[in-house]
């Protein structure tokens, strides 16, 4: 996953020269096909680039990926709708990117959530914790 993210960041840095993209990447492997994860991560980063003020931060740890942007907070009135198809934010396009992210993440047994921070928004992907009863 680390190499995949480095490749995506390299490509996006050339396209978004006004945005600083910071990374803290550890070696980690996520279950699933790299092509699906590439599309998923590109969708989140492209979405972040639409709302960012100055910087995007990407953190990768074991079974944990966080993509932060220092843009405006997300409307929390209906957080589940964020990942629904055709749900378009105020700078959004077709409303499909985050629904693709959600489908990819859940298909491989992970969860995704959008978290408002004091200084921006984080999209966090992590392995679902299964509980033994």
Task: Please provide the spans of the model-predicted regions.
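Conserved micro-motifs of the catalytic ATP-binding
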Residues: 25, 29-35
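Short beta-strand/loop element within the Bergerat-fold HATPase_c
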Residues: 53-64
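Short beta-to-alpha transition helix within the HATPase_c
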Residues: 1-14
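Short conserved segment of the HATPase_c
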Residues: 74-86
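Conserved polar catalytic motif of the HATPase_c/GHKL fold
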Residues: 42-43, 47
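Short alpha-helical Gxxx[C/S/T] motif in the catalytic ATP-binding
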Residues: 97, 101
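Conserved glycine-rich
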Residues: 54, 109-110, 114
């Amino acid at each position: 996953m680390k190499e995949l993210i480095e490749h995506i960041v390299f490509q996006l840095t050339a396209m978004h020269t006004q945005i600083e993209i910071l990374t803290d990447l550890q070696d980690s492997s996520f279950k699933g096909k790299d092509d699906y994860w590439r599309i998923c991560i590109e969708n989140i980063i492209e979405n972040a680039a639409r709302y960012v003020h100055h910087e995007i931060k990407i953190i990768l740890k074991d079974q944990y990926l966080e993509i932060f942007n220092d843009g405006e907070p997300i409307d929390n009135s209906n957080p589940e709708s964020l990942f629904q198809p055709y749900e378009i934010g105020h700078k959004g396009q077709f409303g499909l990117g985050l629904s693709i992210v959600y489908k990819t993440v859940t298909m491989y047994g992970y969860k995704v959530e959008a978290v408002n921070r004091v200084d921006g928004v984080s999209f966090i992907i992590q392995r679902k914790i299964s509980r033994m009863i």
